[in-house]
A protein has these predicted regions:
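Feature captures the catalytic ectodomains and active-site-proximal regions of enzymes
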Residues: 1-112
Length: 112
């Protein structure tokens, strides 16, 4: 799960990158089914990227973020965030620990 961007994305290996994404997609239902009430899972990355771009540098894409689990709204839209710290603030609020910055969007993704 961790290395497919450096092995395929930054190497412009579109087919290898696609294969790894398909493997991850196949594993998601197993991860989600292991969640208990009150849990949620956040999928994200440190940057967006287009493995078909000629450059091996980061490209223009936004950072992806998907949340899943019991009590999470399917298709919740948190819009474009100004900082990645918002993900940390959201997780911190859910865990009831102090946030180091950012603005939580927990209320936008959890059902009542």
């Amino acid at each position: 799960l961790v290395d497919f961007d450096s092995k395929y994305g930054h190497r412009n290996d579109v087919m290898g990158y696609a294969k790894c994404l398909e493997e991850l997609d196949a594993f998601v239902p197993e991860m989600v089914s292991a969640l208990k009430p009150g849990d949620f899972l956040v999928f994200t990355a440190d940057h967006g990227g287009d493995p078909s771009d000629e450059s091996t540098d980061h490209t223009r894409e936004y950072v992806p973020m998907v949340a899943a689990g019991p009590g999470v709204w399917a298709g919740a839209d948190v819009g474009s965030r100004k900082t990645f710290a918002d993900v940390g603030a959201t997780v911190a609020e859910h865990l009831a620990v102090p946030s180091l910055g950012g603005t939580s969007f927990l209320g936008a993704i959890l059902r009542d």
